[in-house]
């Protein structure tokens, strides 16, 4: 069905900036306070109050602009976006419209392979239209009051950076890859804590479809407030199916705002989609134009950390990693630091093995226990020694997994935990040729049927013999040596 249709997706992402106070007032931005305890007269829109720009919010916007190679506007203006909603006391939202603080820029994404669709992993550049500063609205509480709605203005005035892409993504997988890359970037920079459950990072997806080859865009629907990568993927996939089925059944897609219901895994209509003219934007007379000179930009630039994309390129050139692996290992600053700490002890020759372990065994355990790499019970030094013992032939890969789990479970703090466990449990790999030959002779004598099958051309029989040899040594035999000696004796 979808082969006849092209999907067009653009994302608008709201990143809550990690300032201690709000964008136009001195009220706290701390999450979780009792309702309406962090709303000052400015947030309440009391008569006579005036907004004052938060310098920290501006500097975080500058950092983002520099990180994506965008133009940081030397002069931008704030506008009033007029609409009525109970949790918006002023009757308008202070935002930016005609001249945003960040203009253009791009984000490079790594889209993973899809085995079901038989598509390989690939890289794509997503161009950004703009990123602008604005204030968040308050929150309506429907469930706490019978037949009424409560208003919590703690969130009103919280600084947001709204990041808008061009409509260049062509699948839910690309949209998720972009959102994850953007999430990594803003948390890496420290401009947003990225907590999706608390609403610090949320996406609106604009989705439309058009016949393949058609230049004109189809009618789009906007899916609001998607606060998890899974919801983003599911919402887009459902919306694409809905629109295609609607058109093929003779219907027409309506421009509207929709919400995603994660329980039913479907989108539902919320309201008709507004256009810019519906908001009656005009410059806010209470705020001077935002002027950012070159010296300010340079100072902010000098304080920025090394960016994920630069580290990814270094991992590819120095360590021979694939772009996809490098992208995974820079999913957070802590992950990249952990990996580099392991490689610094192991040496570049074992960089790929370190990457495989970090993306495999380590990540598997972290996910199982819902831990961040910074909280890993196995330190980078412990993992480096473990991998060193594989490299020097002291232990096999299978035994290494057992030792890794032992260190993890006992939460060992000594760097030499690997060597201690090897000695205590007698796990040292058997590499003595004479000892291995004796074991192999016993295996061959006890498994004549497998020997005959192998000599008859059945390779599976050889694997069975290796398995028997490893079983006889309780997994401690050097697999490469067993393979070599077994083939010699069978030739």
Curated annotation (Swiss-Prot):
This protein's record includes keyword Ligase: yes
Pfam family, one: GatB_Yqey
Gene Ontology biological-process annotations: glutaminyl-tRNAGln biosynthesis via transamidation; translation
Cysteines joined through disulfide linkages: none
Enzymatic reactions: L-glutamyl-tRNA(Gln) + L-glutamine + ATP + H2O = L-glutaminyl-tRNA(Gln) + L-glutamate + ADP + phosphate + H(+); L-aspartyl-tRNA(Asn) + L-glutamine + ATP + H2O = L-asparaginyl-tRNA(Asn) + L-glutamate + ADP + phosphate + 2 H(+)
Keywords of this entry: ATP-binding, Ligase, Nucleotide-binding, Protein biosynthesis
EC id: 6.3.5.-
GO MF assignments: asparaginyl-tRNA synthase (glutamine-hydrolyzing) activity; ATP binding; glutaminyl-tRNA synthase (glutamine-hydrolyzing) activity
Signal peptide: none
The protein's enzyme class: ligase
SUPFAM superfamilies from the UniProt entry: GatB/YqeY motif, Glutamine synthetase/guanido kinase
NCBIfam families on file: gatB, PRK05477.1-2, PRK05477.1-4, PRK05477.1-5
Subunit comment: Heterotrimer of A, B and C subunits.
HAMAP family xref list: GatB
Protein family: Belongs to the GatB/GatE family. GatB subfamily.
Function (record text): Allows the formation of correctly charged Asn-tRNA(Asn) or Gln-tRNA(Gln) through the transamidation of misacylated Asp-tRNA(Asn) or Glu-tRNA(Gln) in organisms which lack either or both of asparaginyl-tRNA or glutaminyl-tRNA synthetases. The reaction takes place in the presence of glutamine and ATP through an activated phospho-Asp-tRNA(Asn) or phospho-Glu-tRNA(Gln).
The protein, known as: Aspartyl/glutamyl-tRNA(Asn/Gln) amidotransferase subunit B
Annotated source species: Paraburkholderia xenovorans (strain LB400)
């Amino acid at each position: 069905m979808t082969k006849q249709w092209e999907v067009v997706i653009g994302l608008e992402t709201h990143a809550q900036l990690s300032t201690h106070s709000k964008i136009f007032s001195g009220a706290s931005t701390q999450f979780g306070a009792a309702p309406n305890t962090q709303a000052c007269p400015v947030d309440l829109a009391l008569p006579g109050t005036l907004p004052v720009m938060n310098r920290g919010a501006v500097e975080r916007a500058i950092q983002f602009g520099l990180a994506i190679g965008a133009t940081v506007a030397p002069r931008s203006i704030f506008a009033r976006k007029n609409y009525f909603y109970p949790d918006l006391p002023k009757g308008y939202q202070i935002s930016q419209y005609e001249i945003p603080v960040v203009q253009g820029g791009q984000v490079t994404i790594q889209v993973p392979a899809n085995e079901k669709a038989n598509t390989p992993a690939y890289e794509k550049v997503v161009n950004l239209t703009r990123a602008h500063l604005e204030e968040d609205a308050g929150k309506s509480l429907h469930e706490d009051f019978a037949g009424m709605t409560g208003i919590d203005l703690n969130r009103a005035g919280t600084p947001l950076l709204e990041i808008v892409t061009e409509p260049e993504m062509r699948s839910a997988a690309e949209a998720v890859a972009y959102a994850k890359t953007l999430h990594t970037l803003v948390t890496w920079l420290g401009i947003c804590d990225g907590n999706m459950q608390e609403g610090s990072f949320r996406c609106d997806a604009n989705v439309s479809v058009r016949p393949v080859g058609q230049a004109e865009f189809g009618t789009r629907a906007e899916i609001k407030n998607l606060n998890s990568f899974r919801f983003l993927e599911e919402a887009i996939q459902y919306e694409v199916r809905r629109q295609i089925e609607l058109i093929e059944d003779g219907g027409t897609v309506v421009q509207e705002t929709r919400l995603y219901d994660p329980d039913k895994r479907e989108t539902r209509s919320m309201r008709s989609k507004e256009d810019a003219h519906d908001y009656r934007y005009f410059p806010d007379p209470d705020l001077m134009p935002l002027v950012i000179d070159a010296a300010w930009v340079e100072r902010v630039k000098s304080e920025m950390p090394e960016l994920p994309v630069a580290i990814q390129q270094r991992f590819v050139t120095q360590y021979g990693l694939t772009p996809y692996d490098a992208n995974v290992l820079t999913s957070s600053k802590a992950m990249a630091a952990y990996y580099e700490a392991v490689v610094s002890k192991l040496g570049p020759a074992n960089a790929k093995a370190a990457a495989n372990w970090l993306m495999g065994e380590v990540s598997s355990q972290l996910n199982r226990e819902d831990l961040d790499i910074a909280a890993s019970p196995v330190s980078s030094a412990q993992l480096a020694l473990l991998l060193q013992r594989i490299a020097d032939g002291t232990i096999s890969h299978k035994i290494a997994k057992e030792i890794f789990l032992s260190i993890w479970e006992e939460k060992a703090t000594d760097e030499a935990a690997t060597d201690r466990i090897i000695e205590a449990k007698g796990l040292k790999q058997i590499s003595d040729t004479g000892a291995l030959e004796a074991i192999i002779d016993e295996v061959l004598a006890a498994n004549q049927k497998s020997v005959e099958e192998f000599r008859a051309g059945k390779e599976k029989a050889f694997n069975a013999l290796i398995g028997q040899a490893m079983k006889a040594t309780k997994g401690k035999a050097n697999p490469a040596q067993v393979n070599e000696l077994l083939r010699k004796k069978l030739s």
